[in-house]
Amino acid sequence: FSTAFDRVAYSVTGSAHPSEMYAAELGEVGDRKLTGFNDPVLAEVELPTAERILYPSDDGTQVEGWVLVPPGYDPAAGPYPLILSIHGGPHGAYGNSFAFEQQLYAAAGHVVVYTNPRGSTGYGEAFLWAIWGGWGTLDGQDVLAGVDHVVANWAIDEERMGVTGYSYGGF
C-alpha cells in the first residue's frame, strides 16, 4: 500500500508468463502494468498455459494439479513423453504460476504433470498432516494417481515417462 493507503502494488504471474509488477488505485476498476521485464523474450516464444486438473487418488481424496503440454500439442500427433514433477517440502505447493523448469520440458516436447499431493500446503490441516509419519505413502499414491489421470486423458507414450523433483520431491 502507499503511505496514503489508496494504492497497492503487486506481482502478477501465471503458468505462461513470469512475474511482473502492477499497481491499482483502491476503489477503481482496472490496474496498470509497471514492468515489462519479460516482454522482449515473450514476444519471441510460444509458452503454453497449464491446465488445472482435479482427480481422485486411490482412496477418493481429491488432488489438484496442472498439466502443461508442448506448444502446438496435437493429440493426433502423439503419443508424447510425460514428465512428472514433484515439489519439495513436503509442506510446499505448486500453483498457477510461472515455472521455468516445466516450460523448458514442455518446449522440448514433453507433457508435464505437477501436482499437490497430501502433505502440500493450502488444502487444510488434515490434508497437510495426512502423511505425518508416513512419507511416501499417501502422497506417493496421490502423484501416481495424477500420472494415471493424465495417461487416461492426454496422448501419452507410456514407454517414455520420467520423474523429477527437488528436495522432498526427490525423496
List where the protein language model places each region.
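Serine-hydrolase catalytic core recognition
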Residues: 1-171
